């Protein structure tokens, strides 16, 4: 499964790797995943939201076991209730499909994400307000974040 995902992701960029290289990539990826942390700036923002009783949710693509482990390592349970986590493999829709956003009935939401393709396009197509964490300095195409 994981080997297929990296092969499919690279194919989007017209790059192909064999199974041995995909497995090597996945092995290194797993090792690096053990050390992920939430930045102090993000912790401060999440604390501020929580202290002001502003709901926080997560919409994420990927296999549930992998995503839940990542959220556990990031200690997201300090800020996000389990019922406010929407994982594509569980709910049956993936970003940027607006259906995954439409599962959240409270439309007074602002979506924050770092992927233009998945987060900005998905949120805007679901008629959500959206903040793009554009860490790579990419240029927005047709759909603009708020």
Over which residues does each language-model region extend?
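A metal-dependent, Asp-based hydrolase signature
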Residues: 1-26
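Short, acidic loop-to-helix structural element flanking the phosphoryl-transfer center
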Residues: 3, 19, 30-57
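Alpha-helix C-capping/helix-to-loop hinge sites
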Residues: 9-13, 32, 88
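Helix-turn-helix-type domain boundary/helix-start signal
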Residues: 15-16, 36, 94
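Conserved phosphate-coupling serine/threonine residues in phosphotransfer and NTP-handling enzymes
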Residues: 60
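Alpha-helical elements of Rossmann-like donor-binding domains used by nucleotide-donor carbohydrate transfer enzymes
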Residues: 4-8, 28, 44, 99, ...
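Asp-based, Mg2+/Mn2+-dependent phosphohydrolase catalytic module
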Residues: 47, 63-146
């Amino acid at each position: 499964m994981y080997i297929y995902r990296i092969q499919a992701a690279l194919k989007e960029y017209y790059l192909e790797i064999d199974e041995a290289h995909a497995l090597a990539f996945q092995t290194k990826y797993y090792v690096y995943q053990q050390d992920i942390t939430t930045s102090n700036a993000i912790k401060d923002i999440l604390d501020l939201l929580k202290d002001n009783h502003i709901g926080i949710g997560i919409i994420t693509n990927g296999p549930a076991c992998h995503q839940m482990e990542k959220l556990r390592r990031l200690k997201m349970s300090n800020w996000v209730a389990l019922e406010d986590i929407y994982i594509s493999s569980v709910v049956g829709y993936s970003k940027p499909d607006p259906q995954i956003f439409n599962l959240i009935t409270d439309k007074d939401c602002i979506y924050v994400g770092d992927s233009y393709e998945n987060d900005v396009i998905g949120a805007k197509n679901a008629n959500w307000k959206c903040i793009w964490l554009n860490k790579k300095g990419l240029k927005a195409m047709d759909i603009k974040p708020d």
